Amino acid sequence: SILKYVLDCKQYEGKDTSRFTLLDPMSGSGTSKAAADRFQVRSLLYDLNPAPAFGRGNWNALRDDVEDSADLIFFHPPYHTMIAYSGNVWGNAPHPDDLSHCASYEEFLDKLNYCIRKFFLALRKDGRLAVLVGDIRMNGRFYSMQNDLMRMGDFESFLVKGQFNCTSDTRRYRKPFIPIVTEYLLLLKKADALLVPFSVRQTGAFSVADTDLNILTWHHLIRMTMESAGGTLTLSELYLRLGTHPKAQANPHYEARIRATIYEHPEEYVFVARGCYQLSYQVA
């Protein structure tokens, strides 16, 4: 277990573990307490549920302060809306700050990252934040929490954990389907008392239609331009579509370059009629 690993590291380095503390801010059924009891260490359990199995209830991760400090914080958040907790597992109505009731994945991720920042700052020097997350498939889209969440401190380890007895195990799907059968544990170490390195995933988009890159060849520019038109274009149409592209602007003989590229790749461009070509494969 992660608890054993962290304890072993401290003992190997000759550090005192008599006041070792495990904190679980979303403790659920209280599994963390059982682990702490097994290794005879102090445990602190919080949960939004007003009446949790163990520990302090009615604790709001988005609004309440972490009044304690810990050597290991085990954070197992909801997986967005896969399982609704308040108003379903406990309570009679959804709680507005329950991460399992976020209106969008973006809102969920913002709140998840807020929790990660808060919990990491509650670590003692040399402490670890263990974050257990999974993947989500929702409304035809795939979301990977471990890929999207922010990292703080030193990224010490990444563990893959198998999931068993999943709902998808017994379902039949009309479309090809890759089941989600794993969870991931990210172990983040607080190596310095004050300095906190971090990384946040950034996303963006660019259009090849008006962007030049060192890795973009004429062949792939022409091929993708033809894909965008359904797979067939005349040379005149290619000249028109690509004439304003940065590659063409930098090459006064771009029309000749387009013709030469098509000639150099007969396995990709098929002659249809005079001055007209189509891709050798069907465009999706």
Spans of features found by a protein language model:
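Class I S-adenosyl-L-methionine-dependent methyltransferase catalytic core
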Residues: S1-E264, F271-A284
